[in-house]
Structure formats: C-alpha cells, structure tokens
C-alpha cells in the first residue's frame, strides 16, 4: 500500500476513534458493535489427472474479519484481510496477495445529510457509470478511498457528491474518480400521486476520471494525445403504478482510449470512440403472476480507473448488469455468460405463474412454473480506416455503428423452464430444462459455439421434523467442447445443527474424469463450520455478468463463518 493511502487511512482511523468517543459521551448515546468473520481454507493436493497443481504452502486461505460500530449520529468500521497465501482461484492474480486493514471508514449521519470519510461503496442508478462493490467469490473490491457527502435539502430530493482513489487489491490507482448524483422522487411532492399508488423517480449522474497521460506510441514514432479527463453522464426515469414498473436509463461516456480486446478480428486498443448504453426494463406482478421484459444496448462502455489494466476483475468504475438468468445448479452454470462491455445487444423475458391449489394443473398443493429466455448479440460495427503510421485502429475512432442494427455474431442464448411441485406433505420436486447457445470464443477467447441441452431434477423428502433428504440429478448433452456431463448430489440434514453432502460431476464426453466432493456442515447460532474433501473442475465463476477463471484443485477444505 502506498504512503498516501496509509496516511489517508491513519487520518480516517483517528477521526473514527475521536468521533465515536464523542458520540459515546453525548447524552448516553449507545454504541452497537456488529461484525463478521469469514475464513476459507484449502490444504491442496496435486492431481495431474485434472491438472490440479502443487503449491509451495501447505495451506491456502482467504480470511476476512469485519467490525462496525454504530450510534445515533456516528458510525465507523474496518475490515482485516489475510490473503497472503490465497485460494487457488486468486493465487496467480498479480497484486492480490497481502494482509492488513485495507478498508476503514467513519460516517456521520443526520436528518438532512450524511458524510463518509474513508473507504466506501456507491452506485449511481443501475451502475452504468459508477458502481463500487465487494464480491469476495470473484476477488473484487473496487471501493473508493476518499469522501462522500449525501444531502437531502428538501423532501423528495437526494444529492450525492464524492471523490476518491480506487482500490486495486493492496494499492490505490493513481487516477482520481469524482462524481455527483441527484434523484427526485416526484410522488413525495405531489400527494395525489402517492394516494393513487403512482410513483415516479427521476435521476441524473455525472462521473469524472482524472488520469495523467501515458506514453502510447503508434508505429514507434507517433505519440498519441491521451485525454487526462474522461467524463460520463447518466439519466434515468423509473415509473411505478400498482404492480407495473418501468425503468428507462441512458448513459454516455467520453473518449477513453485504453487497452482493449480484439473483436471481429481487429484490435480496438487505444481508439477514440465514445461509449453509450441504453436500457429499458419493464415488470408486472400480482398474486401468482410476474412478467419481466428487458432490452439493453451497450457500446464501448469499459470504464476503468487504470488505463492499462490487464486484470479482468480490477479497477472497474462501472458495471453493466447481465441480462441472463442466474443459475445455481452445477451443470446449468457450467457455461456462464460474461457481459461484454465493448458492445452487445441483450434481451431477457421471463414469465412466472403459480397454478392454484385444487385445480387441474395445480393439484392438491399448487404448482409454480417459470419460463425465461435470454439472447445476447453483437452490435453493428463498420471498421474505419486505420492510422497512417502502422495501419492499426490506434489513434482513430475505430468504427461506426448503427444503433438498432445487429452485428453478425450471436454471443449467447438460453431458454429455461422450471417447474416446482409439491407432491405430498413431505415430498417436493423441482424440474428444469435449459437449452443453451454459448459463444466460447467471445467469452473465453476460443472454442466456437457450444450448444447444449440440460435436464435437472431436484427432489426433497422430509423424513421427520428433524431429518430431510435432498437429491439432485443433472445431465448436460452437447457435441461440442468436452461433450456430455452428469452430476449427482445427496444431502442429508439433521436439524438444527448438521448437514452431510456428497456429490460427483462426471464428464462422459472426453476426459472421463470424476469431480467428487464430500462435505460436513455444522451450524450453531451465529457459527457455521464446514469440512470437505474433493476435486474442483477448472472453469468460470460468474456473478452479475462478471467472470473470472477458476483453476482445477483438489484437497481438504475448511470454511468458517461467524456473525455477531
């Protein structure tokens, strides 16, 4: 961690201690202490059959401990992290290893304003131009270290202003990120709207990145004029009436030449192409029925606080949500889609319906059915002429794009149908079918289109008040990549403390390898301890459209979670 960041953290720590002491002495105001501990450990073993490597350390761990102090007017908190010998997923990530207290903050909150100093997380709108958050399963913590002011000057109006430097593992990026957001809740101004169940929220945001120029050469002789300031803007409107809700949002980002990816066979690194994203999302819900319709177009919306960032999980200022169904079953999540910020058209539709009890389809206990469809396509791109020095796109605007026109490639598509049915007082059955097209070249860099059909059965039988048995059977059929997969799981729960799980994922298409797991879980109050042994397949772990590569591994695992 740099000297500047250490000094900032020291100032915040002293401020937190002083303000909390003042709050404690102010009229007997009580201070509440909450926190959590999370520790995930593996004792790795080499397994050449699945390319599970050996490590210099006998054990690897990601361990976190959070503590937060809250009072009537002052809050403060800190997080300790020990990832000096991190889990295999993060072991080779440049800059990830370390230990210390990288996150500390103090917050003053009153009726009409809040002030935060230190590390903080924030999101403007849907996150198109600003979203800082923590996702430990991916190793993401892109918090800002600085200050944030939230003001509520009048009823229905919220104004935010912030500035800081972004965390990159155990350091801070050199650029400054600043921004402002205003949100108007018109229903709080007009009493008649709320009385009729009508709500309208309008929002606008601005984000600025200031980053000193880098020496980027073209053809070995020409230096690009890199913009030190990049601005981004966002406007949005959210309307709600009864069970109907519609959100429209548009964001624009200025020219931000940066390290890029090769798309359509051409490298678009360091092009001067402004970005934009437009989204329309509509939902309707009432008892027993919900409908979702979404469309989104994005173009050149990668926005990072480090121009030459090579990590796929670090330095992101913004976030583009995925328009695909979140999958929790092992084989349904085998080929997850990663949002492509360089450009995509994305659509999603979902219908969920509950058949009532004592009807022909609902039966004695009723039945839930959910149908989901997602489609992601490339945007139109017409490459412009290259520069005069080496013929590449560097230093040019790269390409033109007609807004409503598709490109030539499908990136992803899936169709899901899920049925949840209670067959008796003690037996529940969930069935799922998924048809998927996954462009492996776009997401992973090579492999072509993978078309798969996935079948899943999930059954739960309640033996008695304390004993429950659950089982899963899954089958993935495909002629591409590694071919067919089979998966089985048995889980026995003894309330209130114990759970025993065994599972196996088997590739019957190419490798004929088994990825077996055995787990014993003990829970008591706020404590949860899990001991396991087995293999983990190499693949991708995704959350919210952000993905990272997971290496294969084998060994003894131990996880502990505690909340207080």
Protein language model annotation of sequence segments:
Residues 26-53, 374-376:
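Short glycine/proline- and aromatic-enriched beta-strand/turn motifs that initiate or cap beta-hairpins
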Residues 38, 193-197, 226-564:
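Exposed, low-structure sequence patches enriched in small/polar residues
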Residues 41-60, 398-404:
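Surface-exposed strand-loop-strand hairpins of Gram-negative outer-membrane beta-barrel proteins
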Residues 68-165, 192-194, 282-308, 482:
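Outer membrane beta-barrel
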């Amino acid at each position: 961690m740099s000297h500047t960041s250490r000094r900032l953290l020291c100032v915040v720590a002293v401020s937190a201690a002083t303000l909390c002491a003042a709050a404690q002495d102010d009229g007997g105001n009580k201070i509440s202490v909450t926190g959590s501990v999370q520790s995930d450990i593996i004792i790795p073993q080499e397994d050449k059959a699945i390319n599970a490597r050996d490590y210099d350390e006998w054990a690897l761990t990601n361990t976190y401990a959070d503590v937060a102090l809250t009072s009537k007017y002052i809050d403060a908190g800190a997080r300790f992290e020990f990832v000096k010998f991190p889990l295999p997923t993060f072991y080779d990530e440049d800059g990830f290893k370390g230990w210390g207290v990288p996150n500390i903050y103090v917050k003053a909150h009153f009726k009409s304003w809040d002030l935060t100093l230190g590390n903080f997380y924030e999101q403007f709108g849907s996150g198109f131009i600003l979203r800082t958050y923590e996702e430990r399963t991916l190793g993401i913590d892109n918090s800002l270290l600085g200050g944030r002011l939230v003001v509520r000057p009048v009823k229905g109006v919220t104004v935010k202003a912030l500035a800081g430097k972004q965390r990159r593992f155990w350091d801070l990026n050199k650029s400054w990120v600043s921004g402002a957001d205003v949100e108007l809740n018109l229903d709080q101004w007009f009493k008649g709207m709320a009385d009729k169940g009508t709500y309208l929220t309008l929002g606008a945001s601005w984000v600025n990145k200031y980053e000193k120029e880098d020496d980027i050469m073209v053809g070995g002789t020409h230096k690009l004029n890199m913009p030190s300031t990049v601005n981004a803007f966002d406007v949005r409107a959210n309307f709600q009436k009864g069970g109907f809700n519609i959100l429209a949002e548009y964001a624009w980002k200025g020219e931000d030449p940066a390290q890029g990816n090769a798309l359509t066979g051409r490298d678009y690194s360091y092009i001067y192409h402004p970005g934009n994203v437009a989204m329309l999302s509509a939902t309707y819900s009432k008892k027993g029925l919900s409908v979702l319709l979404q469309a989104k177009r994005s173009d050149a919306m990668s926005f990072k606080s480090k121009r030459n960032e090579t990590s796929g999980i670090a330095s992101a200022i913004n976030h583009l949500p995925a328009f695909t169904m979140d999958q929790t079953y092992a084989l349904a999540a085998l080929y997850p889609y990663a949002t492509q910020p360089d450009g995509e058209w994305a659509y999603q539709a979902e219908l969920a319906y509950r058949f009532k009890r004592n009807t022909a389809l609902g039966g004695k206990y009723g039945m839930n059915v959910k149908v989901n469809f997602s489609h992601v396509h490339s945007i139109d791109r017409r490459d412009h002429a290259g520069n005069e020095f080496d013929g590449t796109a560097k230093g040019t605007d790269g390409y033109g794009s007609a807004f409503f026109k598709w490109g030539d490639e499908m990136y992803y598509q899936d169709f899901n149908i899920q049925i949840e049915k209670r067959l008796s007082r003690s037996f529940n059955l969930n069935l799922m079918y998924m048809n998927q097209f996954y462009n492996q070249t776009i997401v992973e860099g090579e492999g072509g289109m993978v078309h798969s059909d996935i079948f899943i059965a999930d059954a739960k039988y309640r033996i008695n008040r304390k004993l429950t048995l659950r089982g899963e059977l899954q089958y993935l059929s495909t002629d591409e990549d590694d071919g067919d997969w089979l998966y089985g799981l048995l889980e026995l729960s003894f309330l209130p403390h114990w759970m025993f799980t065994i599972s196996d994922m088997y590739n019957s298409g190419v490798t004929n390898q088994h990825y077996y797991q055995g787990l014993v879980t003990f829970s008591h109050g706020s404590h949860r301890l899990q001991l396991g042994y087995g293999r983990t397949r190499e693949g991708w772990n995704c959350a919210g459209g952000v993905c990272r590569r997971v290496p294969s591994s084998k060994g003894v695992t131990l996880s502990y979670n505690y909340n207080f």
